[in-house]
Amino acid sequence: MAHEGPRQVRDRGMTRSKAEKVRPPTVPVPQVDIVPGRLTEAEWIAFTALEEGEDVVGDILADLVARVIDSAFKVYLTQQCIPFTISQAREAMLQITEWRFLARDEGESAVAEDPTWGEDEEPLACTTDAWAQGSVPVLHARASMGLEETFQGEDQDSVDQIPLGGSWKDSGSQEPMESWELTVTPDSPPTPELLQETGPRSPLEKLGDQSRSDQTDLFAVGSSNSSSQLSMEMVPAGSTHASLELSLVASPQASVERAQPISSQFSLEDLYNCTPQPHAAGDRLELREEKVPLIPSRVLVSDPSAGGPTTLNPSAGFQPQPPWLAEERPSALHSRIGRMGTTARLDPARLPRPDMARSPSPKLWPGAKWPSGWEGEAELLGELWAGRTRVPPQGLDLGDRESQDPHQYRHPVPQVLEATSQVTWKPVLLPGALKLAPGVSMWNPSTQVLLSSSEPQRNDREGSASPPIHTGAPKPQVTVAQLMNSALKMWSLPSKRLPNSKP
């Protein structure tokens, strides 16, 4: 037994050493730093557990304090219930008693010293909105309609006028003109090529057909009869000064009054030019007018002196053509008019007529009626406002108009503006002419100066402080007893006659 004891101890030691040799080495757990070098993960977990413990303790303490305060408040309400009820009943009884009696309102004390009580400043004048409806009159341009033009509303009692205002002689030749005869004779009715029409007719054309039967004195001077032939004959009697100008001038101004006779469309200058002058006594002009249903815008006329046909153009005078174009011209004319007839029907209301801008001044036609004075100016302004006429250019004499190039009238006339409102705007009173009342000021936008009355205000003398508000009623200067006892007195004021009034 003694020998076994030390042997077992020796075996156990050997077994333990073998077991230690076989056990693998322990790997150290890596530490994660929350704050590098200062706070590790283990320390962070310890702090979190400690904080959670403190939160739990804080919640428990808050619950205990809330219970204690709630119990104390209930005890306070129980003690104050009776005194509060008594005070509320007393105030209610006093209010009911005041309702029984009318108490005098003494108002607020020290109103003048109170800065919140003061006069309001003068409100600024409202500015006019330029975009408001009716503030600014808007002008719209009327669209042009080819050769159509506004009828010039002249007096029906005036002398018949002739739509002739161009030159009958060649502008390039300097030698005197030979005697020749011009005759336009539409004996037969218009051919279908001239009156060819496709599609429905417009209301303006129907109105022109209705007014065609009433049109008289188209190319007549001092006569009103009608026949079926139109002939113009001019025989110069050797006078080198005879120069009659014919021109059919048209402008693209839109036609407004369709039923007006054509005899009132032409200006006084054309009639003055076509009337025989004293220095050209040998010249005579015979114009006989008969019923002409339609007149084309271009007419071919035989001219024996020029050796070829002559073209009547609405915007130019007589232009002699060479003989080699005499045969080609009629076919080209008919084909052109045929193409034009397919789109629009010829109408007397659309015939070219002189422009209002070529009307002469009163000194060129002393026998005609011309507006003069304030009434004439008012009538002219009324026509201009209605948009029916245009202002004639000033400073153009008859010689200046004759020297102008006739081809310039081919250019379109500037469009006429029509006003959308008939409201007349009066000019604003000048700030310098106004007499302001004491205490009233006005801002002058042109000079950027605040205008005020010449009389100084009393408030400025006393100071910038606002005047005190009277709390009591003002004392009357006259009592009712004085009014009842005093006799009635009347004073007659001298009558002042107005400077413009008649006696």
UniProtKB/Swiss-Prot annotation:
Residues 1-23, 203-215, 347-356 have a biased composition (Basic and acidic residues). Keywords: Phosphoprotein. The modification Phosphoserine is found at S239, S243. This is Uncharacterized protein C2orf81 homolog. Residues 1-29, 149-227, 346-370, 450-475 are annotated as: Disordered. It comes from Bos taurus. InterPro entries: DUF4639 (IPR028042). It comes from the Eukaryota.
